[in-house]
Curated annotation (Swiss-Prot):
This is ATP synthase subunit alpha. It holds the Pfam family ATP-synt_ab_N. It comes from Trichodesmium erythraeum (strain IMS101). Belongs to the ATPase alpha/beta chains family. Keywords: ATP synthesis, ATP-binding, CF(1), Hydrogen ion transport, Ion transport, Membrane, Nucleotide-binding, Thylakoid, Translocase, Transport.
């Protein structure tokens, strides 16, 4: 029989008492009262914050949105099919955060920054709050650098600057996404990080966009945030903030960034759905009262920072879909009033074959003219006025039978200018190409070219200049000004090519 000495027992007890660490965890726990339609009503979360993350028993995460007297309304960021009435809910004490860093570039992530492209985990070291305050007045500087879209109609008449918010608005199937994708493709070699946020779109459409960007080599500097139509409404309304947060990280590192929200109409609809399910009082068109703030706090995060903060910028191109051209609806008017201008796409122009279908008459860029390159400003100064006069004359000429020679010439010039502004999808033009195309139209070099051959002439001319007059392109790219030497080279190039074109035609 083993004999146990009392002093040994007391020593063991003493050691265990000394090693004992009191680890008390206080957690804020509640109970699910009701769950369904992506919303959970929770009782007992007394100390929860507005916007705090809460965790359900099955691992689903939600956000506390409605803090009422007797319960908390939480929106679910997952399916939540395993959540049962009476199950526990724990407040995490954290606000929603998004992983950020260089590892995101070239990846496709969901509405919370989690990878969904099947390329494995991302090694991100930093994270930022999903909702963060916009830069203040002192932190900003005015827009002065151009953000070239590569689309002649936009860069010449509705210029965009780095740090600007420019709305792209139009009916469905008018080429809104095409303009955004062309702008991303045109940033190749410009050291701009692009973020494309797809909200409530079909997965096949997003896959098509990814394929286009990959084919054009644009995925190397682009992050795609996709909250697809099949995702919960909560993720669809949070996705734009995720995109802004990712771009913000690069902006505060001193980089130029471009964010495209495609589109904010669907985000507003997702937010309306969530708000109505939370029983928030509906307002105009059944949207909640804070739907303006939903978009203003997002778009105000786009800015051009001052040099003390690194001089980074975030340019925002939000997209809004109108119904039958009605820009006076609630969401379109809200976003028009928040942004620094709008590019209006007309379904009539689109159906008539003028693509991109930019309606220059009602499109405007409020701050972009300060950022427009001098070369474009010099050659395109008159183009908007000429097109406006042409549109007026065209309407008048339908009723008048005999037109004088000057009017006929003006109509012919206007038709050719319109041809210059036509552009195929996914083929943005460089700055020298835009300068050459507009210069040849404004200065009458196309007047004696048959209208049906004008587009072919411009395409051939741009190729000829790139191959035979490379110095012209170099001067425009480096100087950003149409110097006398560049103008001489351009005139020579146009004259030489025109002779060969007319002979072959």
């Amino acid at each position: 029989m083993v004999s146990i000495r009392p002093d040994e027992i007391s020593q063991i007890i003493r050691d265990q008492i000394e090693q004992y660490e009191q680890d008390v965890k206080v957690s804020n726990v509640g109970t699910v009262l009701q769950v369904g339609d992506g919303i959970a009503r929770v009782y007992g979360l007394d100390k929860v914050m507005a916007g705090e993350l809460v965790e359900f028993a099955d691992g689903t995460v939600g956000i506390a949105q409605n803090l009422e007297e007797d319960n908390v309304g939480a929106v679910l960021m997952g399916e939540g099919r395993e959540i049962q009435e009476g199950s526990a809910v724990t407040a995490t004490g954290r606000i929603a955060q998004v992983p950020v860093g260089d590892a995101l570039v070239g990846r496709v992530v969901d509405g919370l920054g989690r990878p969904i492209d099947g390329k494995g985990e991302m090694k991100t070291t930093d994270s930022r709050l999903l909702e963060s305050p916009a830069p203040g007045i002192i932190d900003r500087r005015s827009v002065y650098e151009p953000m070239q879209t590569g689309i002649t109609a936009i860069d010449s008449m509705i210029p965009i600057g780095r740090g600007q918010r420019e709305l792209i608005i139009g009916d469905r199937q008018t080429g809104k996404t095409a303009i955004a994708i062309d702008t991303i493709i045109n940033q190749k070699g410009e050291d701009v990080i692009c973020v494309y946020v797809a909200i409530g779109q079909k997965a096949s459409t997003v896959a098509q966009v990814v394929g286009t960007l990959e084919e054009k080599g644009a995925l190397d500097y682009t992050v795609i945030v996709a909250a697809n139509a099949s995702d919960p409404a909560t993720l669809q309304y949070l996705a734009p903030y995720t995109g802004a947060t990712i771009a913000e990280y690069f902006m505060y590192k001193g980089k130029a960034t471009l964010v495209i929200y495609d589109d904010l109409s669907k985000q507003a609809q997702a937010y309306r759905q969530v708000s109505l399910l939370l029983r928030r009082p509906p307002g105009r068109e059944a949207y909640p009262g804070d739907v303006f703030y939903l978009h203003s706090r997002l778009l105000e995060r786009a800015a051009k920072l001052n040099d003390k903060l690194g001089g980074g910028s975030m340019t925002a191109l939000p997209i809004i879909e109108t119904q039958a051209g009605d820009v006076s609806a609630y969401i379109p008017t809200n976003v028009i009033s928040i942004t620094d201008g709008q590019i209006f796409l007309s379904s009539d122009l689109f159906n008539a074959g003028f693509r991109p279908a930019v309606n220059a008459g009602i499109s405007v860029s409020r701050v972009g003219s300060a950022a427009q390159t001098k070369a474009i400003k010099k050659v395109a100064g008159k183009i908007k006025l000429e097109l406006a006069q042409f549109a007026e004359l065209e309407a008048f000429s339908q009723f008048a039978s005999d037109l004088d020679k000057a009017t006929q010439n003006q109509l012919a010039r206007g038709q050719r200018l319109r041809e210059i502004l036509k552009q195929p999808q996914n083929s943005p033009r460089s700055l020298p190409e835009q300068v050459a195309a507009i210069y040849s139209g404004i200065n009458g070099y196309l007047d004696d070219i048959p209208l049906e051959k004008a587009a072919k002439f411009i395409a051939g001319l741009l190729d000829y200049l790139n191959n035979s007059k490379p110095k012209f392109g170099e001067i425009i790219k480096t100087e950003k000004v149409l110097t006398d030497e560049a103008q001489t080279l351009l005139k020579e190039g146009i004259t030489e090519y025109k002779q060969t074109f007319l002979v072959s035609a």
